[in-house]
């Protein structure tokens, strides 16, 4: 190779490197522009646009990346509920139906439920194969929703093999354990209330004869019998740890009279 060819050969290296460097700079510029455009979409702007859009339409929010909308809803929906912004919440349910999962996770969700229920898709399933009912953590709130006219799939089984009923009691068990058994009275539920809960499930076509992934039926879940309340507080007898509901024989008789349960 002569000196000229050697020179030309070596000269190509920095040219190619410069091209790569330029390409990287262009990519950075594009990313910067995207970041800057997203920064301009502030929460205030988003809320303002939602409130002014009447009726609200997805076409009005095509320039709003979905992850931005998701983030705004996730981190602010509790505040919207606390401040009773039902108009905004209804628009969010139309614009972003998955909002219901964030709403249902809020403690005060049931306080605005009646005002937003018409825009809730009760059959919607999230990535965990759950409906919004799986997010409800009190029996009373579940009953209010079951009494509504929303289309619900009460038999939806999530990735853990649980319906919302099993999921609810698993959460109660976790809470019970977390509080070192000190809140036992808070989890005590009357037989009468449990019968009403099961009746509502039956009306919604819940499969009351189904057993979950750890062989629990509706009887095992809703009616945990324990004649010795003091056993609940004993760490030695772990077999009784989850049994904190009481039921009488009359109540069970009425339950089977519904002719929906098959005694085993």
Curated annotation (Swiss-Prot):
Recorded coiled-coil stretches: 19-45
Superkingdom of origin organism: Viruses
Keywords associated with the record: Coiled coil
UniProt key word Coiled coil: yes
InterPro entries tied to this protein: Ankyrin_rpt-contain_sf
Record-given protein name: Uncharacterized protein R365
